[in-house]
Amino acid sequence: MMKCLFLLCLCLVPIVVFSSTFTSQNLIDLPSESPLPKPVLDTNGKELNPNSSYRIISIGRGALGGDVYLGKSPNSDAPCPDGVFRYNSDVGPSGTPVRFIPLSGGIFEDQLLNIQFNIPTVRLCVSYTIWKVGINAYLRTMLLETGGTIGQADSSYFKIVKSSILGYNLLYCPITRPILCPFCRDDDFCAKVGVVIQKGKRRLALVNENPLDVNFKEV
């Protein structure tokens, strides 16, 4: 009888040891939950609201500052203002209010959205409030302009991402990437938005370096 009990104990020892080892080392890697998207915040620390209007303000001061505004593109024959510019200084006029239109839900970092100048306008000029990007052969770059569409697979999609310095950066991220944006070369086929000089005005454009650092102030 004692011999049988002894043999039974010997059989149970490997099971106990295996169970203890398995539990302590946690050999099964359970799938981790995806991190929640981070909401984009305004200058007061509030989450951006698709139903609200905001001014896009540069982080810089003096000649490095200035709000983003809607203006007439040089040499343009468009019937309405069709260019996206930045004022030459933070001491001056306020920028043109915009609203951010996400594909769904709230406004989060690194997610596709449309941008629209939120101003009263005549029917003819409604599409000239929606941001897009177009090629400028003279400057050999792609400029931000208006005349886009909302919710369509074209040249009108952007993202807001956290800046490596202060505030946020804007990215241009077309869905039909290779055709519409030869400048979009990062992993997500997006391009940074910065500033170039066009006939004495600071024009928003796609850049390889020195992106525009901005914040959003509710109107």
Swiss-Prot record:
Inducing stimuli: By abscisic acid (ABA), jasmonic acid (JA) and wounding.
Gene Ontology MF annotations: aspartic-type endopeptidase inhibitor activity; serine-type endopeptidase inhibitor activity
Keyword Signal included in the entry's annotation: yes
UniProt short sequence motif Vacuolar targeting signal, positions renumbered to this chain: 26-31
Residue numbers marked as site, Reactive bond for trypsin: R99, F100
Entry superkingdom: Eukaryota
Annotated site location: Reactive bond for chymotrypsin: M142, L143
Propeptide regions on this chain: 24-32
Keywords carried by this UniProt record: Aspartic protease inhibitor, Disulfide bond, Glycoprotein, Protease inhibitor, Serine protease inhibitor, Signal, Stress response
InterPro entries per record: Kunitz_inhibitor_STI-like_sf, Prot_inh_Kunz-lg
Functional summary from the UniProt entry: Inhibitor of cathepsin D (aspartic protease) and trypsin (serine protease). Protects the plant by inhibiting proteases of invading organisms.
This protein's name: Aspartic protease inhibitor 10
